[in-house]
Swiss-Prot record:
Pfam families: Cullin, Cullin_Nedd8. One of its GO terms (cellular component) is Cul4A-RING E3 ubiquitin ligase complex. Disulfide bonds: none annotated. It is found in: Cytoplasm; Nucleus. The keyword Phosphoprotein applies. This is Cullin-4B. The modification Phosphothreonine is found at residues 15, 106, 202. A motif (Nuclear localization signal) lies at residues 112-115. Residues 1-14 have a biased composition (Basic and acidic residues). Keywords: Cell cycle, Cytoplasm, DNA damage, DNA repair, Isopeptide bond, Nucleus, Phosphoprotein, Ubl conjugation, Ubl conjugation pathway. Residues 1-157, 189-211 are annotated as: Disordered. Core component of multiple cullin-RING-based E3 ubiquitin-protein ligase complexes which mediate the ubiquitination and subsequent proteasomal degradation of target proteins. The functional specificity of the E3 ubiquitin-protein ligase complex depends on the variable substrate recognition subunit. CUL4B may act within the complex as a scaffold protein, contributing to catalysis through positioning of the substrate and the ubiquitin-conjugating enzyme. Expressed in oocytes (at protein level).
Length: 970
């Protein structure tokens, strides 16, 4: 290998020597196993490495400052001094005597790194370097290296390597005394081999001479001893070195045996050290000052543990702790101690014990982290202290009973409202938890006492207090127990404790609470109390379900009182709307919008609102009519829209929607024909809501009514153009609404005696209309007509907006001054009831254009009427409202009958559709299918009549073999 290559290799090895020390050591081990390339001298024998047996050491190995001591033993080397310099000096002197015959001065070496020199006659031989790390045990023997001098005597790691060119070693040397080797740090500076190899022109000659000498010499391979420091004690490992003669049969060995006599601790060191430690422990236990430095005590424990005295040390420590704890038990067996004083005494003992064990553990920390940690069966020093305290203090039956009873007594006092020392409770319960007896010794009794206390309290307070007050008390108790859990109870008790309180104060009284106070809370709309009720019931298993059932029963009962009582018909719909708003608010605010309560409310409304068939539907229709009629000043357009939305919610619950349709259509016709509709937009909005809810078929006729009104406007435009070409006397303006009979309600025709001017105008319009639409028939509905009259009174002229019947009555007074009831009836032909309502509106209302004699609110037979010339009013145009015709029983029955007729048609159609599809069906299945298709309730008797009617009309027949089965007839 060239000089530049060797220099480069040395530089790289110097840079990486620290990081790759372990890798270098591994490479050297492999090199030893494989053996070096065959040199011209005899092969090297592999060294023997016995397992390391660290000797006992009392003092620590000195550092680099002992470098000079090694030099005095082995001149020309750098290293640490041996613990036994006399033996090492003798060994070195003996080696020198064998090698002083022909040795030259060793070149200066670096203080950090040594180099071994060897000669080779082959031109391919290369220099090899070895780095040794003082921190790891060296197991690789040093390899021979080239040297610049022809003959050298060098030392490898504190061991001399002898070379001789004349006299072979005949004597077998043994080191019988103790010998300790010190390793050299691989970071030491590398000696400059390149300068030594090139310093003399005779380097090649010297190398040849050295090779010649090596042929007749034996090489001593020295082993490396490295010092390991662990826990302050020095451990050394040695290897055996051997000589190998260059000639077979003349090999001599230098055997260095392992240490026979290891350094021992001074006599009585263990006893004296333990005595110091014992005194320190007793001082801690007695709360007196410690004579020794804590660091010194810690070091003493470390020294004892390092010399395998850990087991005995642990036993002694346990014994002294146990003796001290046993001595504490007598103070707790006094019967005269008060429970609180006893608890304070046991707490003080526990606190002292914890403080003592912390200090003791800090001194014996090395023992705790080495010996105890390696023995899994042994408890740590802290756990040992807990075991001893539990075994000798708390496990004492008298002490434990008195402790638990005292704790329970303090908790009971606090529950009764007394002030207690909560920090004392927290400390004692923490002690029980640390000693792992909390659940077995305390928690079970604590929960039993809790159940007993709250069971009695619940029974007592349920009888004495009202529901709102009781609910607040329960909530307060739950908050108190939660605070105890946070303050001094263990968190493992939380679930059991809260469940116990909830069960005794709530779970055992769910039904009683609801039966006693739910109705009053709902009636009085006590939102906060209802919220608390729901919150508490949600904590108990099954509580919400019980509350839900009572909620349903309340809605059904309260709603039934609204619907069933006929006296409340006038206010039924408004009360239903108010009740619905109330329960919605309770659900949103108190029940947190629970879907179960929402669905239960809907089912309850549907149940009670249909207990009275047809009537709710009729009243809802009339209520809508009152809100959509002109003159309603109760709400703005936005409020009217919201009100209609609420009505539609109630409308969803009723079964008889066809009844609603019949009455709604009747009222809508009046609003459209008489012009009493408050807003066309509101009318169409309501129609849109009905269509969305019930479908297009439900509103088809209602939509047709609006279309007729639009077409009538177009026809009247054409009629006015037609009237311009007609020679009609007078200045009467006629407006006619053309209605399709199928869309509008059925009205009973009433023949009346119209004035001749009106009759003439009717004929003109009839001629005009039939001329455009041949084949059609007009039927006049005089009950729906209205007029505008101009009247003159003493105060002045007025315009009167009146119905057709009112117009006919007022026009009679152009012919006379006074008329009786019979005379007016005969002249106008108006039906008696209608005439009485007409006269009542003219003579008994707010705008009294007629005067009645005798005076009174009702129209009686024999009454006479005269024109009130003294009539006064601040308005020019006055609308005289006709007395609202109260629907008689016959008229209501007529409307209901029409609804029933429509239902019959729907039932017949449903039966035919089902039989046509199924062909053959039993009676029960047919009835079930019909119920599923119909949208209104049907009595079984009515359904049976419809089946018999279809059989009579040959739509279906009974099966001849099975009378309970029907067959469809195609």
């Amino acid at each position: 290998m060239s000089r530049s290559t060797r220099s480069k290799e040395r530089r790289e090895n110097d840079t990486d020597s620290e990081d790759n020390s372990s890798e270098t050591s591994n490479q050297e081990r492999r090199r030893c196993r494989q053996g070096p390339p065959r040199p011209p001298y005899p092969p090297l024998l592999p060294p023997v490495f016995p397992p390391p047996t660290p000797p006992p050491q009392v003092r620590r190995t000195r550092g680099l400052q002992d470098l000079g001591a090694m030099k005095s033993v082995c001149p020309g080397t750098s290293g640490f001094s041996s613990p036994n310099p006399s033996a090492a000096s003798a060994a070195a002197q003996e080696v020198r005597s064998a090698t002083d015959g022909n040795t030259s001065t060793t070149p200066p070496t670096s203080a950090k790194k040594r180099k071994l020199n060897s000669s080779s006659s082959s031109s391919n031989s290369s220099n090899e370097r070895e780095d040794f790390d003082s921190t790891s045990s060296s197991s690789t023997p040093p390899q021979p290296r080239d040297s610049a001098s022809p003959s050298t005597s060098s030392f490898c790691l504190g061991v001399p390597v002898a070379t001789s060119s004349h006299v072979p070693i005949q004597k077998k040397l043994r080191f019988e005394d103790t010998l300790e080797f010190v390793g050299i740090d691989t970071k030491m500076a590398e000696e400059s081999s390149s300068s030594s190899s090139s310093s003399s022109p005779t380097a090649a000659t010297s190398q040849q001479q050295q090779q010649q000498q090596l042929k007749t010499k034996s090489i001593l391979i020295s082993s490396v001893a490295s010092v390991h420091h662990a826990n302050g004690l020095a451990k050394s490992s040695t290897a055996v070195s051997s000589f190998a003669n260059s000639k077979p049969g003349s090999a001599k060995k230098l055997v260095i045996k392992n240490f026979k006599d290891k350094p021992k601790l001074p006599e009585n060191y263990t006893d004296e050290t333990w005595q110091k430690l014992k005194e320190a422990v007793e001082a801690i236990q007695n709360s007196t000052s410690i004579k020794y430095n804590l660091e010194e005590l810690y070091q003493a424990v470390e020294n004892l543990c390092s010399h395998k005295i850990s087991a005995n040390l642990y036993k002694q420590l346990r014994q002294i702790c146990e003796d001290h704890i046993k001595a504490q038990i007598h103070q707790f067996r006094e019967d005269s101690l008060d429970s609180v004083l006893f608890l304070k005494k046991i707490d003080r003992c526990w606190q002292n014990h914890c403080r003592q064990m912390i200090m003791i553990r800090s001194i014996f920390l090395f023992l705790d982290r080495t010996y105890v940690l390696q023995n899994s069966m042994l408890p740590s020093i802290w756990d040992m202290g807990l075991e001893l305290f539990r075994a000798h203090i708390i496990s004492d039956q008298k002490v434990q009973t008195k402790t638990i009873d005292g704790i329970l007594l303090l908790i009971e006092r606090e529950r009764n409202g007394e002030a207690i020392d909560r920090s004392l409770l927290r400390s004692l319960l923490s002690m029980l938890s640390d000693l792992q007896i909390y659940q077995d010794s305390f928690e079970q009794q604590f929960l039993q006492e809790t159940n007993r206390l709250y069971a009695a309290e619940g029974q007592k307070l349920m009888q004495e207090r009202e529901v709102p007050e009781y609910l607040h008390h329960v909530n307060k108790r739950l908050e108190e127990e939660a605070d105890r859990l946070i303050t001094y109870l263990d968190q493992t008790t939380q679930k059991s404790l809260i469940a116990s309180v909830e069960k005794q104060l709530l779970g055992e009284h769910l039904t009683a609470i609801l039966q006693k106070g739910l109705n009053s809370l709902l009636d009085e709309n006590r939102i906060q109390d209802l919220s608390l009720l729901y919150q508490l019931f949600s904590r108990v298993r099954g509580g919400v379900q019980v509350l839900l059932q009572q909620w349903i029963e309340y809605i059904k009962a309260f709603g039934s009182t609204i619907v069933i009582n006929p006296e409340k018909d006038k206010t039924m719909v408004q009360e239903l709307l108010d009740f619905k708003d109330k329960v919605d608010h309770i659900i949103d605010t108190c029940f947190l919008k629970n879907e179960k309560f929402i669905n239960a409310m809907k089912e309850a409304f549907e149940t009670f609102i249909n207990k009275r068939p047809n009537k709710p539907a009729e009243l809802i229709a009339k209520y809508v009519d009152s809100k959509l009629r002109a003159g309603n000043k109760e709400a703005t357009d936005e409020e009217l829209e919201k009100m209609l939305d609420k009505i539609m919610i109630i409308f969803r619950f009723i079964y008889g929607k066809d009844v609603f349709e019949a009455f709604y259509k009747k009222d809508l016709a009046k609003r459209l024909l008489v012009g009493k509709s408050a807003s066309v937009d509101a009318e169409k909005s309501m129609l849109s809501k009905l269509k969305h809810e019930c479908g297009a078929a439900f509103t088809s006729k209602l939509e047709g009514m609006f279309k007729d009104m639009e077409l009538s406007k177009d026809i009247m435009i054409q009629f006015k153009q037609y009237m311009q070409n007609q020679n009609v006397p007078g200045n009467i303006e006629l407006t006619v609404n053309i209605l399709t009979m199928g869309y509008w309600p059925t009205y009973v025709p009433m023949e009346v005696h119209l004035p001749p001017e009106m009759v003439k105008l009717q004929e003109i319009f009839k001629t005009f209309y039939l001329g455009k639409h041949s084949g059609r028939k007009l039927q006049w509905q005089s009950t729906l007509g209205h007029c505008v009259l101009k009247a003159e009174f003493k105060e002045g002229k007025k315009e009167l907006q009146v119905s057709l019947f009112q117009t006919m009555v007022l026009l009679m007074f152009n012919e006379g001054e006074e008329f009786s009831l019979e005379e007016i009836k005969h002249a106008t032909g108006i039906e008696d009831g209608e005439l009485r309502r007409t006269l009542q509106s003219l003579a008994c209302g707010k705008a009294r254009v007629l005067a009645k004699n005798p005076k009174g609110k009702d129209i009686e037979d024999g009454d006479k009427f005269i024109c009130n010339d003294d009539f006064k009013h601040k308005l020019f145009r006055i609308k005289i409202n006709q007395i609202q015709m109260k629907e008689t029983v016959e008229e209501q029955a007529s409307t209901t009958e029409r609804v029933f007729q429509d239902r019959q048609y729907q039932i017949d159609a449903a039966i035919v559709r089902i039989m046509k599809m199924r062909k053959t069906l039993s009676h029960n299945l047919l009835v079930s299918e019909v119920y599923n298709q119909l949208k209104f309730p049907v009595k079984p008797a009515d359904l049976k009549k419809r089946i018999e009617s279809l059989i009579d009309r040959d739509y279906m027949e009974r099966d001849k073999e099975n009378p309970n089965q029907y067959n469809y007839i195609a």
